[in-house]
Amino acid sequence: MYTEGFIDVTGGRVSFQKFDENGGGTPVIVLHGGPGSSCYSLLGLKALAKDRPVILYDQLGCGKSDRPMDTTLWRLDRFVEELAQIRQALNLDEVHILGHSWGTTLAAAYCLTKPSGVKSVIFSSPCLSAPLWEQDQKRNLKKLPLDVQETINRCEENGTTDSEEFAAAIEVFGKHFVNRLEKQPEWLEQKPSGYRNADIYNIMWGPSEFTVLGNLKNFDCTTQLKEITCPSLYTCGRFDEATPETTEYYSSLTPKSKFHVFEKSAHMPYIEEPEEYLAVIGDFLNSI
């Protein structure tokens, strides 16, 4: 059964989709990346619905959700509140949480409010420390051709991260550390226009992946990961922006955690190795 609709949250309405093939199992709710992206690239996770309901939603300001102009809404605590409001609206008394990239920042911040009924949390290509993420990207940058490094550094220094040469350099970075597929799935190429909201990304992260200037600049929950006591799974790609070393470090700080690396992937193993990704995630959820 497929359901879609809108949920009222602080600041506007968010669009959600629910996939449910047999009505059994504890639901899993998926938190997309960004900040300011949408759930469309994660739609392949609906395959998990053979065992449990799967809920995807576009965070406020993104995708099909409302796009309010109030920039004070683009704060981590407001997105945490939004997740709580969605759970309440959908009567998700018990739930698994799967966050990807920025979605793991949101998942961790939410779990640290000690909500009831969270059966497990999956940190997929996690960002749980903005300073660590920034350090890792500086190291990743050094693995690229020298001219690409120089372009990115020059554009950051000159404030020209909106230029065509910066975009071209970022594309090279992406082919190394974000999505390494030569040919993208056809459904991914048909992405909806305007699904991203660059304003949210700029306010919360900044104009560049490599230097955090937004309001997440000081986010670091590593010292609190010991407080996440439900079962957890940390995953990343071998060539991920969310490096295996840092991801394993987060896992080591979290009780009841498991760690898995997708050997052929960068930051999007759910697209780069979809069968393996679904198998690992599905097995973990079914073990709870």
UniProtKB/Swiss-Prot annotation:
- Regulation of its activity: Completely inhibited by p-chloromercuribenzoate (PCMB) and heavy metal salts. Partially inhibited by proline and proline derivatives with proline as the amino terminus. Enzyme inactivated by PCMB is reactivated by incubation with 2-mercaptoethanol.
Which EC main class describes this enzyme? hydrolase
Outcome of mutating C62S: Activity same as wild-type
| Any single Gene Ontology cellular-component annotation | cytoplasm
Family matches, as InterPro entries: AB_hydrolase_1 (IPR000073), AB_hydrolase_fold (IPR029058), AB_hydrolase_sf (IPR050266), Peptidase_S33 (IPR002410), Pro_imino_pep (IPR005945)
Catalysed reaction equations from the record: Release of N-terminal proline from a peptide
Q: What is its EC number?
A: 3.4.11.5
Q: Where in the cell is it found?
A: Cytoplasm
User: What keywords does the record list, in alphabetical order?
Assistant: Aminopeptidase, Cytoplasm, Hydrolase, Protease
Query: Mind listing the GO biological process terms from this record?
Result: proteolysis
Q: What the protein does?
A: Releases the N-terminal proline from various substrates including at least dipeptides Pro-Pro, Pro-Gln, Pro-Trp and Pro-Tyr. Also acts on amides (Pro-beta NA) and oligopeptides including Pro-Leu-GlyNH2, Pro-Leu-Gly, Pro-Phe-Gly-Lys, Pro-Pro-Ala-OBut and Pro-Pro-Gly-(Pro-Pro-Gly)(4). Higher activity toward small peptides (up to three residues), but very low activity for longer peptides. Has no activity against p-nitrophenyl acetate, poly_L-proline, Met-Pro or amino acyl amides other than Pro-betaNA (Pyr-betaNA, Phe-betaNA, Cys-betaNA, Met-betaNA, Leu-betaNA, Ala-betaNA and Z-Gly-Pro-betaNA).
Protein name listed in UniProt: Proline iminopeptidase
Native organism is Heyndrickxia coagulans (Weizmannia coagulans)
| Protein encoded by which gene | pip
